[in-house]
Regions:
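Positively charged, small/polar-rich N-terminal and surface patches that mediate targeting and assembly
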Residues: 1-124
Length: 124
């Protein structure tokens, strides 16, 4: 199994999620983040260095996470790349990591079986 972590512009999220759902991605997590550091240009938005808080609040970056079978990782990663690429700085990054196991809390299913859609969902 693999985990895809894609850091993309917020404006791309809906089309990425829609397409990954069409491709039957087993589960998608979206997290809004505030990046600091690598790849960030201090004056990208024209603010002075002392305006650090204001500068970071304008970055619209979202992390998309998908855990999937090895056979699907290239297809899902390419879908994200294709939909988010403008050819400009700030398009984002995709990271792919190995996942040693997955365990469904409800019934103890493990591995790829845990990634399949559960038959029923009940929240207590």
């Amino acid at each position: 199994m693999k985990e895809i972590k894609a850091y993309i512009q917020r404006c791309c999220v809906n089309k990425v999620v829609d397409e990954l759902e069409k491709e039957h991605a087993p589960g998608i997590t979206i997290v809004e983040i505030h990046p600091v550091g690598y790849g960030y240009e201090p004056n990208y938005f024209g603010f002075q260095q002392h305006d650090a808080y204001k500068r970071y609040s304008y970055l619209r970056i979202v992390k998309v996470e998908v855990v999937c079978a090895d056979r699907d990782v290239d297809r899902f990663a390419e879908t994200i790349r294709r939909l988010c690429s403008t050819g400009s700085r700030g398009d984002g990054m995709i990271f792919i990591s190995d996942v040693s196991d997955a365990i469904r809390i409800r019934n103890g299913d493990r591995g790829e079986q845990a990634l399949t859609q559960p038959k029923e969902t009940t929240c207590h």
